[in-house]
């Protein structure tokens, strides 16, 4: 069985933290996704504040170097989140360096006992469909946060030529960032504008395919 949980990111919101959480809860979201480096409270205090609004929690943040993985994931685990989302490595790392990164990340994921997903983010290891496919084939236990807006930006096209890579990525996605990208950036100026209808349709199809893959898992 699969339960779809919808989270609102604190990213881009204005006002104080309590006001933001109140707005998220009032809007009917299941939880909040918070960037760890922007949280001024201690993990326990932040967790209690989130709990007071009956919200679930996803913690997100960057990990660039393998040596940072264990201490950073242990810090994120102290927030007792439902899961952790990572901006992983750098796009300039070799495949050998990237493999060393994910090997350590998966080992630490087991140690902390919380699911970790690695975001398909520009500037990071999973910045293209083909690099992502390489790592997913190397590591069957690796899961991703699908933010394909970055891929459209990096590829400067809707990557329809990447059928195998997309199918593999969709089968390993356990978290989605519902953002629509285009050739010139990771965020279309207005998803309602007719010139971006193909981009919206393409992203929505990937999200449907991810849902189908999760239901079949």
Task: Put a short name on every predicted segment.
Residues 1-9, 32-34, 55-61, 82-86, ...:
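Hydrophobic faces of well-ordered beta-strands that scaffold small-molecule active sites
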Residues 57, 61-144:
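Active-site acidic/histidine proton-transfer and metal-coordination neighborhood
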Residues 164, 198-217:
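A short, acidic, amphipathic alpha-helical segment used as a generic capping/interface helix at domain edges
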